[in-house]
Structure formats: structure tokens, C-alpha cells
């Protein structure tokens, strides 16, 4: 039986590819998709979810728009990474359907209530919507199997020296998620920076030759340009968000550790930092499965294999 998942995202090139991977995988049953502000403004990330589902002929999936700003802060977006639309590069179709007439939290709660088995929440943007769900519906915590997030890092940040972008945007929300008591799986920069897509991988995807694989290649063409900056020291572009879906499909591709994670919300230099108690110094029980390594070639092969689904 397929694993029921709720996808909360802020597309974003890598979010879009995570959607493509999830919907090409019969092991997963995507019950609903909610959008969050992050990589772009809330209007644009919602539109990008609708555009991607229109491209994939999955207008049957319920979509709802989430919070327009973080819990306690002003919104920061990553338009320098993802462009004016949030999905600059390919020519994507206009949305062929409308979102649900409800909020993201309402759609999430409805989905959890109606599911016969616990649902896995996959969150590839700031954690605002998930935190609002957890705070407003404690009675539904038991309906959540786990929360798989792309965010954080044990080591260096990518938005500040200490913080990864998704967590930095709304650290208070991320702290609510990590301390919720619900199992959390963290795909942080320690693993996503190893899940790099090289130019030859992009050409491999393009050569598959179907409309979706072509769009994915064009998304990566744009995404690779930003990551050519020498400061990163990358060979390709880190494909952050699809690591969450890939872990659900093939956990054997990833090396993980069980550790306690907290989020710094006050620090002068460290706001948004995920503090991973790697050496068990706090005495706190582990609250997260933290990804630390990936079989890069296996990850690329999985993407290439699933892109053939759209032939």
C-alpha cells in the first residue's frame, strides 16, 4: 500500500523537482500539497505549485495556500537563487485549476482527519504551516507518522554563516516542529550539498526526452548558474528538497544518525542555526533522524529512473 504524504513546499526549483519525483513514485500517495512563502512570495509559490501540477496532469490533487509570513518575523525570500517567478528557466504552463477555498492548515487538518492511517508530512520550505498545524490541532498529532524536512545543518549555513535558509526564515516554527514529540527526519545541508547534480546529469535527464524530463533539465540549467559562484566550491548544484522524497523511496541511499536537534531563535550571530547534539552533550533524548551522507550516484540514478515515468 502506498505511503500517504502531505507535501508542504515553496517552489523553488528543487521543490518543483521534489514534486516531480513524488508524483512519479507509486510507493507514495500524495494526498495534498500546500504552499508556503520562502523561495518567493506566497502568491508566486502557490502559482508554482499549480503550474507544476498542471504540467504533470495532476490537477486532482488538492492545493491550498499557507501563511503569508513567518510566525514572528518579516518574510525573507530567495529571489537571487530562484529568479523573479520562483521557477525561472523553463516555459511552464499556466495553472489549469484553482486552489481549495481554505487555508493550508485547514487542508492539512482535513487530510489528516480523513486518512485511515498516519500521514507523513514532507516540508521543503520554512516550517510555518507545519508549526501552525501542530499548535492549532494537538488532537491530530497522533495522525502524523513523521515530519520529513529539508532544512538546517550540523555544520555551515548557506544564508548566514550559521543558518540554512529554510530554518532562518522561520526559526520559531522550526523549533516547534523539532520539539513537538513527533518523529522528525532532517535533510540538512550536510547531506544536500553532497546530492549535487552535475552538468552531465542534467544532459542525461534531457536525453530521456519526455516533456517533464526536459522541463527538469531546464530548471537545472537555471539552478546550476547560481551555484557556479566559486564561493560554494561546488561541481554542480545541490538538489536539496528531493532528498526528502528520495529518503522515503530509498532510505538505503542515505546515512543517518539519531540526535537531539534544537533551533537557535535568539543568537546575535546564530539565529536560525540548528544545534545538533552530535556528541550527546546535552543529555537530551534524540528527537530527529539526521541525514549526514548520500550515495550521490544512486540519488541521480533514482531521479533518472523516475523521470521515465512521464514518457
Swiss-Prot record:
EC assignment: 3.2.-.-
Gene Ontology CC annotation, any one: cytosol
Main function: Hydrolyzes with equal efficiency cytidine or uridine to ribose and cytosine or uracil, respectively.
Organism domain of life: Bacteria
Keyword Ribonucleoprotein: no
Transmembrane region(s): none
Residue positions of the active site: 240
Keywords tagged on the record: Glycosidase, Hydrolase
One GO process term, biological-process aspect: purine nucleoside catabolic process
EC class: hydrolase
InterPro entries tied to this protein: I/U_nuclsd_hydro_CS (IPR015910), Inosine/uridine_hydrolase_dom (IPR001910), IUNH (IPR023186), Pyrim_hydro_RihA (IPR022975), Ribo_hydro-like (IPR036452)
GO molecular function per UniProt: purine nucleosidase activity; uridine nucleosidase activity
Alphabetized PROSITE patterns for the sequence: IUNH (PS01247)
Native species: Escherichia coli O127:H6 (strain E2348/69 / EPEC)
UniProt record similarity statement: Belongs to the IUNH family. RihA subfamily.
Protein name: Pyrimidine-specific ribonucleoside hydrolase RihA
Amino acid at each position: 500500500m502506498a505511503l500517504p504524504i502531505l507535501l508542504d513546499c515553496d517552489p523553488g526549483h528543487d521543490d518543483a523537482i521534489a514534486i516531480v519525483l513524488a508524483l512519479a513514485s507509486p510507493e507514495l500517495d500524495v494526498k495534498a500539497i500546500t504552499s508556503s512563502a520562502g523561495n518567493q512570495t506566497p502568491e508566486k509559490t502557490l502559482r508554482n505549485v499549480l503550474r507544476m501540477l498542471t504540467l504533470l496532469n495532476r490537477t486532482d490533487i488538492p492545493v491550498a495556500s499557507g501563511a503569508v509570513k513567518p510566525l514572528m518575523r518579516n518574510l525573507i525570500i530567495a529571489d537571487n537563487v530562484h529568479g523573479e517567478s520562483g521557477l525561472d528557466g523553463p516555459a511552464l504552463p499556466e495553472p489549469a485549476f484553482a486552489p481549495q477555498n481554505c487555508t493550508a492548515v485547514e487542508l492539512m487538518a482535513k487530510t489528516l482527519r480523513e486518512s485511515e492511517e498516519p500521514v507523513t508530512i514532507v516540508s521543503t520550505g520554512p516550517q510555518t504551516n507545519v508549526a501552525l498545524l501542530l499548535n492549532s490541532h494537538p488532537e491530530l498529532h497522533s495522525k502524523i507518522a513523521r515530519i520529513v524536512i529539508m532544512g538546517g545543518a550540523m555544520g555551515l549555513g548557506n544564508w548566514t554563516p550559521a543558518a540554512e535558509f529554510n530554518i532562518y526564515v522561520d526559526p520559531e516554527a522550526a523549533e516547534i516542529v523539532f520539539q513537538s514529540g513527533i518523529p522528525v527526519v532532517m535533510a540538512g545541508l550536510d547531506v544536500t550539498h553532497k546530492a549535487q547534480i552535475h552538468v552531465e546529469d542534467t544532459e542525461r535527464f534531457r536525453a530521456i526526452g519526455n516533456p517533464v524530463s526536459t522541463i527538469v533539465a531546464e530548471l537545472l540549467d537555471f539552478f546550476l548558474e547560481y551555484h557556479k559562484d566559486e564561493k560554494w566550491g561546488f561541481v554542480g548544484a545541490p538538489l536539496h528538497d528531493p532528498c526528502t522524497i528520495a529518503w522515503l523511496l530509498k532510505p538505503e541511499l542515505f546515512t543517518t544518525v539519531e540526535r537531539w536537534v534544537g533551533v537557535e531563535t535568539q543568537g546575535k550571530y546564530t539565529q536560525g542555526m540548528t544545534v545538533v547534539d552530535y556528541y550527546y552533550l546535552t543529555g537530551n533524548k534524540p528527537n530527529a533522524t539526521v541525514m549526514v551522507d548520500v550515495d550521490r550516484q544512486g540519488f541521480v540514478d533514482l531521479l533518472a529512473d523516475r523521470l521515465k515515468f512521464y514518457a
